[in-house]
């Protein structure tokens, strides 16, 4: 009887010791990003997420963030996370459309959802579930990773006065907007962020789209291409966090929750950080860079872009039932939420500007 009691005590002690060890175990993950080490606020979102995860887990979840300068593959983030070369990634979903066209809509679609509308779609309208459905084939989980809000339409060497001025123009513009521009006659290319200024300076391109005043001014595009156009193509550009599914499933449940909360908080932090940065840069741009000519695309160009957008969406939907499901979900959500956007934000601004 005494031996049985001793054995029981030993088993319980071993169990408790194992639980304590498991609780105190440190999990170290590596994350690759598309961004350079100074590309705020994009790189900030990744670094802040890692910081939050470390702090909330009391050091049990440590994430090392590698910028594009480290791994040299800014557009290869999905492949590296899928293969297990990195445990996590931070990029933009539409960069992977060449690998999987279904990833396209999760960044932003031309003439689509605004940032508040898109966040509501992700978390209340089924968008996050559709994102997981698309990334499941890659054995990767994907989450919203920070929004730039409305992006500016780009920097051009010459003024665009009509649709004819776009014919043969060489422009860096990614995502679905690139497909639309190609349809109306633009020679479209995609270039990594760190190479944009050089491409413009060396006449490899005639125009480029980047983000907004804060990030654009720091890149110096205005020194070469003074015509700065307002946006139409990315009303709510959302970055994305990716996690290798096998890695995620090996984390204890509490660390899984801490990780998902860290990503969500870092994403929203980037949105408000970028909004403030753009507002500050816009004031600086108006006072310190009078050579910049801010304007909008002519009505005939906008009409052609909207027509191309409608045609291409139908064509893409016919190619992939899953892509059509995502696009239909966004369209249906716009129909429901846009009425409130008009009644709230639009009318408030209309009456107070």
Could you say what each language-model-derived stretch is?
Residues 23-118, 128-353:
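N-terminal secretory/targeting leader peptides
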């Amino acid at each position: 009887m005494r031996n049985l009691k001793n054995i029981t005590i030993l088993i319980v002690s071993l169990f408790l010791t194992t639980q304590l060890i498991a609780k105190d175990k440190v999990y170290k993950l590596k994350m690759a990003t598309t961004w350079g080490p100074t590309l705020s606020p994009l790189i900030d979102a990744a670094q802040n997420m890692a910081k939050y995860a470390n702090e909330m887990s009391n050091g049990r979840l440590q994430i090392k963030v590698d910028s594009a300068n480290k791994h040299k593959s800014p557009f290869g983030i999905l492949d590296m996370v899928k293969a297990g070369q990195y445990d996590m990634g931070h990029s933009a979903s539409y960069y992977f459309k060449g690998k999987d066209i279904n990833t396209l809509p999760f960044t932003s679609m031309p003439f689509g959802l605004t940032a508040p509308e898109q966040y509501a779609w992700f978390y209340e309208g089924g968008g996050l579930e559709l994102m997981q459905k698309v990334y499941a084939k890659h054995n990767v989980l994907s989450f919203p990773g920070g929004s730039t809000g409305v992006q500016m339409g780009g920097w051009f060497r010459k003024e665009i006065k009509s649709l004819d001025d776009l014919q043969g123009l060489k422009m860096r513009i990614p995502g679905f907007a690139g497909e639309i521009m190609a349809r109306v006659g633009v020679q479209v290319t995609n270039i990594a962020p760190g190479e944009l200024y050089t491409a413009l300076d060396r006449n490899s391109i005639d125009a480029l789209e980047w983000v907004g005043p804060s990030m654009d001014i720091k890149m110096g595009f205005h020194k070469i291409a003074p015509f700065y156009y307002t946006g139409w193509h990315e009303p709510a550009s959302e970055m994305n966090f990716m996690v290798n599914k096998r890695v995620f499933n090996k984390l204890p449940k509490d660390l899984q929750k801490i990780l998902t909360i860290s990503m969500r908080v870092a994403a929203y932090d980037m949105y408000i950080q970028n909004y403030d940065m753009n507002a500050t840069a816009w004031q600086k741009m108006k006072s310190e860079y009078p050579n910049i000519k801010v304007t909008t695309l002519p009505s005939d160009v906008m009409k052609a872009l909207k027509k191309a957008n409608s045609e291409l969406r139908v064509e893409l939907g016919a190619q992939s039932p899953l892509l059509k499901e995502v696009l239909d979900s966004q369209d249906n959500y716009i129909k429901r939420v846009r009425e409130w956007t008009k009644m709230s934000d639009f009318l408030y601004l209309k009456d107070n500007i």
